[in-house]
From Swiss-Prot:
Protein name (record): Chalcone synthase 1
Family as reported in the entry's similarity comment: Belongs to the thiolase-like superfamily. Chalcone/stilbene synthases family.
Alphabetical list of PROSITE patterns matching this protein: CHALCONE_SYNTH (PS00441)
Active site per the UniProt annotation: 166
């Protein structure tokens, strides 16, 4: 018998077709806050009502945020039990960690259960797990906890991503694509779960960028199943993952920073994050879509991480995008706030649901090609090229 070559083994290991998103699930805590009422609540619960000028500033931030409501695990009762979390910079990491190490995997499980149900295959067919959170750290990690909570096989191959921030919804899809395409038959469960218990704190007029975070961030978890060569009798691809890239923007050092301290996760923001992103976004688009021969940015569908309304406004203006291009993105920002890594997966879910309800020809608003952008600390940008799937009538 002839010896098997390494090349033959490698060929057998690889999938034939591209990776695709096969199912999506999302989850939020039950508790939510409306943006209109939030300034009064926030300044009351943090015992900061004497800071009247700062409260007015915060009200203006909330008014301009384009957010209607946000979901939050932290209820008034939890905050009353943990007064140090309500202070501006009081030691509180233990209390925060105690919450997130339990709640982050739990919320992730809710989203994963929905994705697995839609996928339609037994969970024993999940070969890989990617878990991503910027909310706390622990060993063994959320990936291990979720494996136990879901009852996945102990041999599932796990990846744990901590402290990546808002670009990571793109990162997880890039990793899942590589795993699915290089491991024949692989089915990758991807989970992003974020809870603001690590960043919530009272206001200070010396740290206005922290206040921006208090006005924007919300809690949520999203899960997707990614695989290549779908079993068409059961699996229904939603979006193909065609290519994926990551880059650090020039002259952007320190634009967005987060530091884990005794006081929790602190958040620092340079004012011109929207300018840095909008100035460089066309370069990323040209690199991604040049090989496909696309240069009209209104001819593709858009999934952009909604870091805040200013980023979306400036990207729209810089590229001359029609208003409807960022509709799904703005919809998610309005109804959930900025959920860090989970946002782009929520937007994928929103878009495919809108397309089905409106009778569109494809999952990409009737278009074939689309882009998914993640923006976050670094400044780091993730660019994923998507191919939509026809919606069967």
């Amino acid at each position: 018998m002839a010896a098997v070559t390494v090349e033959a083994i490698r060929k057998a290991q690889r999938a034939d077709g591209p990776a695709a998103v096969l199912a999506i699930g999302t989850a939020t805590p039950a508790n939510y806050v409306t943006q209109a009422d939030y300034p009064d609540y926030y300044f009351r619960i943090t015992k900061s009502e004497h800071m009247t000028e700062l409260k007015e500033k915060f009200k203006r931030m909330c008014d301009k945020s384009m957010i209607r409501k946000r979901y939050m695990h932290l209820t008034e009762d939890i905050l009353k039990e943990n007064p140090n979390m309500c202070a501006y910079m009081a030691p509180s990491l233990d209390a925060r960690q105690d919450i997130v190490v339990v709640e982050v995997p739990k919320l992730g499980k809710e989203a994963a259960v929905k994705a697995i149900k839609e996928w339609g295959q037994p969970k024993s067919k999940i070969t890989h797990l990617i878990f991503c959170t910027t909310s706390g750290v622990d060993m063994p990690g959320c990936d291990y906890q979720l494996t136990k909570l879901l009852g996945l096989r102990p041999s599932v191959k796990r990846f744990m991503m901590y402290q990546q921030g808002c670009f990571a919804g793109g990162t997880v899809l890039r990793l899942a694509k590589d795993l699915a395409e290089n491991n024949r038959g692989a089915r990758v469960l991807v989970v992003c779960s974020e809870i603001t218990a690590v960043t919530f704190r009272g206001p200070a007029d010396t740290h206005l960028d922290s206040l921006v975070g208090q006005a924007l961030f919300g809690d949520g978890a999203a899960a997707v199943i990614v695989g290549a060569d779908p079993d068409e009798s059961i699996e229904r691809p939603l979006y193909q993952l065609v290519s994926a890239a990551q880059t650090i923007l020039p002259d952007s050092d320190g634009a967005i920073d987060g530091h884990l301290r005794e006081v929790g996760l602190t958040f620092h923001l340079l004012k011109d994050v929207p300018g840095l992103i909008s100035k460089n976004i066309e370069k990323s688009l040209k690199e991604a879509f040049g090989p496909i021969g696309i240069s009209d940015w209104n001819s593709i569908f858009w999934i952009a991480h909604p870091g805040g309304p200013a980023i979306l406004d400036q990207v729209e203006a810089k590229l001359g995008l029609k208003e409807e291009k960022l509709r799904a993105t703005r919809q998610v920002l309005s109804e959930y706030g900025n959920m860090s890594s989970a946002c782009v997966l929520f937007i994928l879910d929103e878009m495919r649901k809108n397309c089905a309800e409106e009778g569109r020809a494809t999952t990409g608003e009737g278009l074939d090609w689309g882009v998914l952008f993640g923006f976050g600390p670094g400044l780091t940008v993730e660019t994923v090229v998507l191919r939509s799937v026809p919606i069967k009538a």
